[in-house]
Amino acid sequence: MKMHKRLSQIAVALTVVSLAGTAAAANIVGAQSAGSGASTITVGESQVPFGPHTAGKAGVGISSYAAGIKVDFQGLTPSSAATELHPGTDKGMTVYQLHDPITTGTPGDPNNPAHAGLGSFNFVKVGTGDVWFGEWSTNGNTGSPTYQNRQVYYVGDKTGYTAATGTAVGYTLTGLHRYGANTHLTGSLTANFSSRTFHGDLSIGATQIRLGTSGSQIAFDTNGHFDAANAGQWVIPGNFVLKTGDVKGDFFGAQAATVAGIVDFGDQSMNIAWGGTKN
């Protein structure tokens, strides 16, 4: 009976997907690093309208589950363990952990189902809008090796975006890199909305992640989007650049209230997801 109900729900979701082309598309943007396993994730507009989930929001799908249909991140939060990151300094950054098999759900509660077989999610809500970043792997900080097939991502709703004003607009940043085995990264970003450029950095211990190579800036377009090849650096003590990576992301909200992105080093063990709120 439960399987029949689940199959019926999936059928409804597939119908929603097939009808999506006839409806106005939500303004959801995002990106993820490449996957390497049998299962991979893709971020984008959510398509599931039942249970705890809502269609048309920032979401994620797993290729090996229900044909990769995307569910919204907000709908995953009731089933997740929540931790506020350095409260009082980053305007409400909260990391949610949804882990298989740790997150068992509540039997009989359609708004808190079990998530067995869906892998391990660490994801962060940025500010008050529908903006998220995080990491996914098949096993998280368990097993050997840990964090298998790891991917990082960001996704959010661009509706209502307007540029900020000023040549030195500051943001407080948070980043994730194998959260659970490590703590979160912290940092800052300064954006010039006249020249549409920014630079920033994140750090954890003695490791620094530069957003913009030493002495250079990353450009963003009139819609607050950026995609800069080899513009990120993984820097270790001695100012040695261990690796460079692509920096992708977006500013979101009125007056560019938030920002989120990834640094894709082409190495699942090094890739970073990050985001922040305007100071």
Report each predicted region and the residues it spans:
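Gram-negative bacterial Sec-dependent N-terminal signal peptides
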Residues: 1-26
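Mature soluble binding/inhibitory domains
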Residues: 25-279
